[in-house]
Amino acid sequence: MSNGIVIIGSGFAARQLVKNIRKQDATIPLTLIAADSMDEYNKPDLSHVISQGQRADDLTRQTAGEFAEQFNLHLFPQTWVTDIDAEARVVKSQNNQWQYDKLVLATGASAFVPPVPGRELMLTLNSQQEYRACETQLRDARRVLIVGGGLIGSELAMDFCRAGKAVTLIDNAASILASLMPPEVSSRLQHRLTEMGVYLLLKSQLQGLEKTDSGILATLDHQRSIEVDAVIAATGLRPETALARRAGLTINRGVCVDSYLQTSNDDIYALGDYAEINGQVLPFLQPIQLSAMVLAKNLLGNNTPLKLPTMLVKIKTPELPLHLAGETQRQDLRWQINTERQGMVARGVDDADQLRAFVVSEDRMKEAFGLLKTLPM
């Protein structure tokens, strides 16, 4: 490969790929292009920065220069890719262009901001760069509104509450974590958040935001309103697929790839939050790690299909942490819930009494690996 491999992106997926490639080939040219600084940080830490009193710069684990030196890379930070010419195998920015033999798209996904009037007043915490832009406002805020009661929204609500802030969480679902599990399973965490002082506005809709002299006025449905100092959007992630579209790639919820992480173009691959693998979007660390291992082999000519095991998802709410696995969102499961003071085990079984999913909490999380072995592959 005279031109080598070009990777667009510098987050967890891109770095895992680089490490796996370099384990197998120390000399193949590797070029990384990204719109950010390319410094390494641990993205899950963003759910805990406020209670930990951390600044954005505290999150940096390795600078871009150190990364480039360690793994023999050509890095182009603070660089926006404007176009991909798939036929000529060229990546273009405003001032530069790079020829590639193989191209990997690993640009992640952006936080979705609900399209309501005043949406520009909403903050997002999807990157170190985004946190750096709003850390002073968040640190000084006494009243915080979190829009979205999913995994990230629940983690942030607990973190801001632990930091002594008045937290309101709004979601149009009837319970928190509604896309992950039924209300009878999430109720333990929901109750804990309420006990801590989080004000839950469920089955509620944010209609607009307006700056006032004393903060931000959030208008809700049913003629309600609340004044806060900061509003955070935690309503999910959306891959930015415009670049892939211009390259003529097949797009659905992400860039569509097969078991080899290959897109509809033989020389272009996708990884991480950006990729939709055989119809699945898996924005969690373990599938990204496994995908990076397989993709490194494929890029170097050792074609290997990705085979994902059943994996744990961890909800990092320190006062009441949860692990879950399997088809927890299935509507037809019967849930057998065993609750004790030290934790909960919830088993989701089908009509044949076959375990299909489980959720465990607190001290009973140690039972997760035993349950994981009994789930069908």
Curated annotation (Swiss-Prot):
Cellular localization per UniProt: Cytoplasm
Catalysed conversion reaction: 2 reduced [nitric oxide reductase rubredoxin domain] + NAD(+) + H(+) = 2 oxidized [nitric oxide reductase rubredoxin domain] + NADH
GO molecular function: oxidoreductase activity, acting on iron-sulfur proteins as donors, NAD or NADP as acceptor
Main location: cytoplasm
Main enzyme class: oxidoreductase
Keyword NAD: yes
A matching Pfam family: Pyr_redox_2
UniProt-listed SUPFAM superfamilies: FAD/NAD(P)-binding domain
InterPro entries: FAD-bd_OxRdtase, FAD/NAD-bd_sf, FAD/NAD-binding_dom, NO_rdtase_NorW, Rbx-bd
Domain of life: Bacteria
Cofactor(s) listed in the protein's UniProt record: FAD
Keywords, comma-separated and alphabetical: Cytoplasm, FAD, Flavoprotein, NAD, Oxidoreductase
E.C. number: 1.18.1.-
Hydrolase found in the keyword field: no
This protein's pathway: Nitrogen metabolism; nitric oxide reduction
Annotated GO CC locations: cytoplasm
Family label: Belongs to the FAD-dependent oxidoreductase family.
Annotated function: One of at least two accessory proteins for anaerobic nitric oxide (NO) reductase. Reduces the rubredoxin moiety of NO reductase.
Protein name: Nitric oxide reductase FlRd-NAD(+) reductase
Organism this protein belongs to: Shigella boydii serotype 4 (strain Sb227)
